[in-house]
């Protein structure tokens, strides 16, 4: 009886008339449209309505988290670079982070189809394109999911409300305007699921290949979870139709044998059908592995096609770059498999429910998943639910999908479609069981019925307990009551519907999806609450100020007047600095800032440890603009757009809302000098002398210094040591070996912070610093007794011990901020050494802003001083490299060409972060590169005039190109073979029909 009902309800591919199902329209321009088309259109507009209600009424469809600083700005840079160079597959980004491997930004859509499509529409601003495409992709998710689920043979109402359930996922909408790569691959994943069905039903792989390719190009990080979900779905779909596949394989084998072997082939076919029919959960190994290979080949073709992105990105991530995250367990990835904790199940219900950083469904998803696993059905029917439960509960999978860095629930978002499909099948099976109950009400004993009902009710009780235990979670606490209400409502709906007499219907309908309806409604309210509670939408006025076209016009105007090779940055408050960290207004603009999950590790180490600039943000991957005037000079920041004048800069132009300041003496991006010190000597200098010396000398490796010293005669050594700048010793320098190198313009002073002991604020002086406890952020004024006359710069350095380690704390001195992140933050910056180098106020007052918390400041030291004399810095920078054609004319923007004239043998010094994949040619001859200033490109240069060519070759680029070529060939072979099989099949079908006609004609004649 159950088998007949299942066949009646779930048999795919047949058109059934159901009560309440929309009929096809046959009038006017609507002719040919079916009820499914109108339902899909309704879901499309419903998605747009959610975007309006949840996001757009509060601001633009973008957030202040990563959207404004990464997704919109980096996509805009990719397009600008393409327009300037015409290079669709670049290797290097000269404009960002001082110069970075462009595959550090591959995560943000370097080759994403939606970004590449924007190249055809230069008249549409990229931020508007990103907003519009995100809205359309979200709406496409709803439509494609409905198209996929409606092919499962489910009740029309079940398909509709399962699609609404999917659309209301908090993760799907929230990340459509926050971290786009979390969800922007979803349309391709849904197309791939349709491609799996098409592959098994029609033996066509084109859709599957293209969908896998699109998913990887859009978000290679989340495509791993997507491929795992695809594989699990493909295995279960194959096992569900195991009988048909076994019979098909036997038929194929039968066609290959001759007539003399027909009896044996028929025997093999009968044996295959018998094993498939009796086992019902397994198929023959030969058939299974054959199907597995046929499925793996198109997936492999899609992966190989994306090699042009995957291999260079992997080389950039694991070949010496930095990457965000906590790090793996001991032993790396392999160590995860031997760690017993990785195999211990964890039942984290919030991994599925109510948080945008998980799958983001309601509690009913957990009920359905457990119900499918616990329920009475064949193993092959609930295998997918069982696999999903294993993926969600075994910690090993969370770590592996996160690359071994940490266990974050975001990597399970690709399982959203298959989980929602299991929810729909759970509801459908409830209808089947109720029909069975109605038709067999008098059969069966009471004890069996009670046990069946308890088994059906058990998932609701388990989820209720899990939700109650999770209510204390930080991000779930504001709306845990919605989760409890959800479980109670769906349980009540289930009981009311389950025990309602089977033959009595509600207005002629059985409504098996009533719990799903209530759950979808509660999920929609939860989504509204979550989006409001996060409150990361950007108000329109703020967005318009950040993207003001006047800024772009000013930068283009400056570039037209001064087309040299330098850097130009914006400095404002914290929100502006974060929003502009990756923003390039004009392709000629270069910045020293970068915010990416991957970056040049040499440059990051130089900023944080060697040079010691301030860290203003809690995320350690944010390498934002600094108002440290010596760092700006070192990095060649010639122009700064700001509201106040930094030390060492003069007003260049006033645009009303902002001003442009020009450096009096900024370093060229590349220059030649012979004023050098060894790396050992440099590292012996304390702060702030380690910053100050780079105004008058460059740092080269010890071995290069020894070569230079050995090549200079003794008399020249003596003359050279007296000449140039190595004259006066610094009385404040702690290491005597560095004393003769330069004369420091800084001297130690005492910074006196007034002590206080109030209810909300306590400041107590200690032996080597201060202990501060404040219940809110406060600003205090400090004095500098004994400050040097004419001092313009203030340097402060101290260590921080945070007494509330789980909470953030910050200290801001004269507008410059240092922040220490709580230890529980995933991307905690670990910034316990606070360094400040700021411009002093005219009256000498120091304003200190202290953040809420309890912390101890140790080894508190203060200096005042001024920049090195102008003649010394000009002498260091006098032999600058002049570019020919800018940074876009050589090798598709992956190289630069310049000329330089060196008076004496010296060194090429740059502020381009060191990377071993650079190739330098001086007058056509390849020259060895080394680390200058401990982290930048440098090389030995002889005297005379030279032509310099510096080219970057992204590692893995050639291998990726060959991989994509192989993938294209494999895809072409698969398509051709499938076409031939279809043609042969149609020819055999035609021959069979002809034989039948001939036989019929013969019988009639006889």
Regions found by a protein language model. Give the residues of each.
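Extracytoplasmic/lumenal acceptor-recognition loop(s) of multi-pass membrane glycoenzymes
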Residues: 98, 104-107, 520-542, 557-631, ...
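Membrane-interface coil-to-helix junctions
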Residues: 47-142, 164-186, 317-322, 330-351, ...
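Perimembrane helix-loop-helix junctions
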Residues: 226-300, 490-495
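Start-transfer (signal-anchor) and selected internal transmembrane alpha helices
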Residues: 1-56, 290, 294, 495-499, ...
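Periplasmic/ER-lumenal interhelical loops and adjacent helix-loop junctions
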Residues: 253-254, 291-413, 471-478
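Membrane-embedded helix bundles of polyisoprenyl
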Residues: 44-48, 134-152, 156-240, 294-319, ...
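Contiguous transmembrane helix-bundle modules in multi-pass membrane proteins
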Residues: 222, 379-547, 943-981, 985-987, ...
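Active-site-proximal, structured, solvent-exposed surfaces of multi-pass membrane proteins
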Residues: 16-17, 22, 74, 739, ...
């Amino acid at each position: 009886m159950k088998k007949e009902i299942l066949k009646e309800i779930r048999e795919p591919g047949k058109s059934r008339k159901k009560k309440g199902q929309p009929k096809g329209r046959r009038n006017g321009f609507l002719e040919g449209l079916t009820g499914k088309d109108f339902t899909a259109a309704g879901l499309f507009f419903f998605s747009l309505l959610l975007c309006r209600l949840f996001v757009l009424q509060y601001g633009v469809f973008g957030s202040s988290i990563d959207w404004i600083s990464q997704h919109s700005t980096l996509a805009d840079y990719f397009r600008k670079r393409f327009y300037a160079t015409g290079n669709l597959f670049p290797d290097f980004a000269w404009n960002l982070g001082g110069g970075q491997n462009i595959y550090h930004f591959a995560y943000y859509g370097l080759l994403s189809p939606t970004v590449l499509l924007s190249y055809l529409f230069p008249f549409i601003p990229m931020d508007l394109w990103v907003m519009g495409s995100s809205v359309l992709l979200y709406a496409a998710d709803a439509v494609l999911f409905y198209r996929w689920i409606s092919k499962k043979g489910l009740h029309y109402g079940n398909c509709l409300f399962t699609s609404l359930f999917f659309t209301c996922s908090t993760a799907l909408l929230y990340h459509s305007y926050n971290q786009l790569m979390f969800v922007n691959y979803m349309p391709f994943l849904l197309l791939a699921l349709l491609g799996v069905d098409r592959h098994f039903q029609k033996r066509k792989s084109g859709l599957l290949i293209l969908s896998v390719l699109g998913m990887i190009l859009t978000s290679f990080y989340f495509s791993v979870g997507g491929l795992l979900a695809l594989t699990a779905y493909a295995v279960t779909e194959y096992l569900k139709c195991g009988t048909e596949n076994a019979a098909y394989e036997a038929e194929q084998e039968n066609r290959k044998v001759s007539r003399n072997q027909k009896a044996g082939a028929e025997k093999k076919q009968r044996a295959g059908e018998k094993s498939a029919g009796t086992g019902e959960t397994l198929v023959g190994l030969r058939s299974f592995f054959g199907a597995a290979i046929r499925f793996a080949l198109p997936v492999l073709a899609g992966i190989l096609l994306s090699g042009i992105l995957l291999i260079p990105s992997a080389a950039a991530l694991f070949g010496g770059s930095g990457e965000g995250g906590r790090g793996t367990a001991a032993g790396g990835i392999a160590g995860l498999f031997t760690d017993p904790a990785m195999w211990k199940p964890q039942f984290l219900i919030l991994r599925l429910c109510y948080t945008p950083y998980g799958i983001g469904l309601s509690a009913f998803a957990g009920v359905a998943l457990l119900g499918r696993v616990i329920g009475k059905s064949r193993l092959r029917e609930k295998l997918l639910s069982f696999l999903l439960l294993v993926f969600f509960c075994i910690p090993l999978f969370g770590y592996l999908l996160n690359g071994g860095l940490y266990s974050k629930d975001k990597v399970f978002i690709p399982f959203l479609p298959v989980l929602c499909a299991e929810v729909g099948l759970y509801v459908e099976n409830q209808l089947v069981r109720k029909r069975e109950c109605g038709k067999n009400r008098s059969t069966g004993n009471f004890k069996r019925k009670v046990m069946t009902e308890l088994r059906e009710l058990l998932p609701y009780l388990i989820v209720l307990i899990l939700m109650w235990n999770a209510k204390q979670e930080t991000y779930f606490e504001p709306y845990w009551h919605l989760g409890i209400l959800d479980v109670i409502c769906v349980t009540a709906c289930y009981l009311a519907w389950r025990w309602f007499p089977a033959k009595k219907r509600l207005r002629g309908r059985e409504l098996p999806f009533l719990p799903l309806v209530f759950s979808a409604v509660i999920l929609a309210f939860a989504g509204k609450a979550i989006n409001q509670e996060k409150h990361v939408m950007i108000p329109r006025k703020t967005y318009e100020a950040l993207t003001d076209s006047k800024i772009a016009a000013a930068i283009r105007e400056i570039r037209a007047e001064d087309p040299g090779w330098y850097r130009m940055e914006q400095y404002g408050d914290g929100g502006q600095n974060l929003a502009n960290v990756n923003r390039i207004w004009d392709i000629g603009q270069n910045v020293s800032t970068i915010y990416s999950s991957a970056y040049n590790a040499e440059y990051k180490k130089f900023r944080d440890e060697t040079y010691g600039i301030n860290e203003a943000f809690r995320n350690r991957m944010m390498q934002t603009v600094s108002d440290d005037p010596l760092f700006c000079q070192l990095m060649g920041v010639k122009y700064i757009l700001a509201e106040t004048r930094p030390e060492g800069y003069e007003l260049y132009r006033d645009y009303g809302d902002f001003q442009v300041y020009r450096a009096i003496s900024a370093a060229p991006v590349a220059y030649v000098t012979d004023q050098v010190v060894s790396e050992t000597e440099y590292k012996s200098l304390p702060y702030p002398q380690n910053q100050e010396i780079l105004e008058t000398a460059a740092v080269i490796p010890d071995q290069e210094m020894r070569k230079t010293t050995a090549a200079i005669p003794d008399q020249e050594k003596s003359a050279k040591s007296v000449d140039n700048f190595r004259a006066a010793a610094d009385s404040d320098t702690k290491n005597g070996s560095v004393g003769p190198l330069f004369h420091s313009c800084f001297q130690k002073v005492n910074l006196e912070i007034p002590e206080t002991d109030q209810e909300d604020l306590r400041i107590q002086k200690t032996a080597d610093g201060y202990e501060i406890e404040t219940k809110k952020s406060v600003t205090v004024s400090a004095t500098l007794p004994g400050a040097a006359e004419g001092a313009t710069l203030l340097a402060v350095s101290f260590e921080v011990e945070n007494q509330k380690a789980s909470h953030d704390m910050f200290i801001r001195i004269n507008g410059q901020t240092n922040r220490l992140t709580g230890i529980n933050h995933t991307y905690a910056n670990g910034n316990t050494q606070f360094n400040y180098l700021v411009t002093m106020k005219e009256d000498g007052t120091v304003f200190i802003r202290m953040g809420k918390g309890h912390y101890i400041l140790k080894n508190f030291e203060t200096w005042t001083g001024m920049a090195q004399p102008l003649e010394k810095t000009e002498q260091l920078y006098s032999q600058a490299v002049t570019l020919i054609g800018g940074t876009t004319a050589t090798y598709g923007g992956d190289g630069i060409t310049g000329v330089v004239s060196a008076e004496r043998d010296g060194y090429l010094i740059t502020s381009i972060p060191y990377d071993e994949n650079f190739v330098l040619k001086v007058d056509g001859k390849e020259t060895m590169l080394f680390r200058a200033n401990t982290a930048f490109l440098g090389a030995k240069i002889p005297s005379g005039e030279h032509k310099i060519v510096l080219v970057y070759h992204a590692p893995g680029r050639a291998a990726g190109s060959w991989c994509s070529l192989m993938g294209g060939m494999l895809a072409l072979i698969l398509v051709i073979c499938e076409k031939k099989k279809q043609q042969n099949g149609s020819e055999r079908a035609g021959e069979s029909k002809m034989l039948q006609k001939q036989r019929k004609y013969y019988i009639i004649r006889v």
